[in-house]
C-alpha cells in the first residue's frame, strides 16, 4: 500500500492532496514538495471513508485536536458522541479517542464511521482491555496486535511512545523532576519495561510497526513520554534526550514512506516555548509539531484552558502545527460538554492568534470583524466570531434600546460617535 508520502515522492497528486490544496489555497507543487520531504502530512487511513482530509504542517493553518473518551469512573458513550458533535460544529480537524477502560472498539468504530475529522488513538491505552491481560502478562509483540487492530479499524494517526527506549529511560532516572513521567502511555510503557527488564516494544519492533502503518497509511504521532508535566521539568535532559530519539525514528519512518508528526510539551514557561519549537524543527528536519498546550503555569487549576491558550498561541506563532485542546477540567476530572466547548474555543483562538503571526492571509477575517464593528453590524459580528452563538447570547442578555451601541457604552459608543462626526453630523449624548 502506498501512503500520501509515497505518492508525493512519485509526483502523484491524490484526491486528498487536492482537497487540502483547495482549503489552504496552496499550489500543487508546494504540497507535493513538502509532503514528499515530511514537512506536511495528510493523515488519511484508507479505511476512514467519512474523512474530510486536512493537512498539518509547514505553510498551513494551525490545526486543533479534541480529546475525548471514557474512563473507568465515567462510562457514558452517548455523552462522548455529543462531544464529537460539538467538535464537528466548530470544524475541529482532529479528534482523539483516549478511552482507557473496557472494550473500546465499538465506540472507536462508530467514531470512524461518523466523523469527518481525522481520528487518533493511543493503542497502549487499549492494551489491557483488548488483550484481557494485566500489564505484566502482556508480551512485547502483543502491543503490536493492538496497533494492528486500531489501524485496521480506520484511525488516521496513532500516538506511539517509541522514543522512551532504554537510553532515554536511563537519562530520566538521573533527572531530578518534580513530576516524573506524566504521559499516561509513557508511564505504562516505562512500568512495563521496568517490570519485564526489557526494551520498549515499540522501539524494539519499530520496523514491524512501520509495516502496519504502511498497510493502512496510518500517520505516526511520535509521543513524548518524557514531556514535562510541570514548568520546573521543562527543557530538561530527559525531554531533550527523547526528542533526539524521536528525530532518529522520524527518519526511519520517512525512509519507507510513513508520515510522521512529533508530539511536544506539556508544561513550559512562556519564555522557553519559542526555542523548543525551533529545536524540534531543527532536530526532526521540519516534521510537523503537535503540542499539548503548552501550559505556561502550573497553578491555573479550573482555568487551564487559559494557560493552555496562552502557551498554544506562542507555540503556534513559533512554528507548532497542531494544538491539542485543554479544557477547564484539566488535572481535575473528565471534562463535560461545557468544558469541551470552552476548551475548543480557547484553543481555536490560540491557533488563529498564531496563524496571524505566521500566515499574513489569516488576518482577513479579523479585518472583516473590525469593519463590522465600525459599521455596528451585529449580525455580521456574530457570524465572524469563533463562537458566534455565545456572542449573540451575551449581546441579547442586555440588549440595548438603540442598536447603534451595546449596553456597555450606550450613547457614548465610540464607533457610533465617530461614524456620526465623520459624516458631518452633530453628536448628542443627552
Curated annotation (Swiss-Prot):
GO terms for molecular function: 4 iron, 4 sulfur cluster binding; carbon-carbon lyase activity; zinc ion binding. One of its GO terms (cellular component) is cytosol. Pfam families: ThiC_Rad_SAM (PF01964). The keyword Lyase applies. Keywords: 4Fe-4S, Iron, Iron-sulfur, Lyase, Metal-binding, S-adenosyl-L-methionine, Thiamine biosynthesis, Zinc. Its cofactor is [4Fe-4S] cluster. Pathway: Cofactor biosynthesis; thiamine diphosphate biosynthesis. Zn(2+) binds at residues 267, 331. [4Fe-4S] cluster binds at residues 406, 409, 413. GO terms for biological process: thiamine biosynthetic process; thiamine diphosphate biosynthetic process. It catalyses: 5-amino-1-(5-phospho-beta-D-ribosyl)imidazole + S-adenosyl-L-methionine = 4-amino-2-methyl-5-(phosphooxymethyl)pyrimidine + CO + 5'-deoxyadenosine + formate + L-methionine + 3 H(+). It comes from the Bacteria. Its EC number is 4.1.99.17. PANTHER family: PHOSPHOMETHYLPYRIMIDINE SYNTHASE, CHLOROPLASTIC, THIAMINE BIOSYNTHESIS PROTEIN THIC. Homodimer. This is Phosphomethylpyrimidine synthase. It comes from Campylobacter jejuni subsp. jejuni serotype O:6 (strain 81116 / NCTC 11828). The lineage of its organism: Bacteria, Pseudomonadati, Campylobacterota, Epsilonproteobacteria, Campylobacterales.
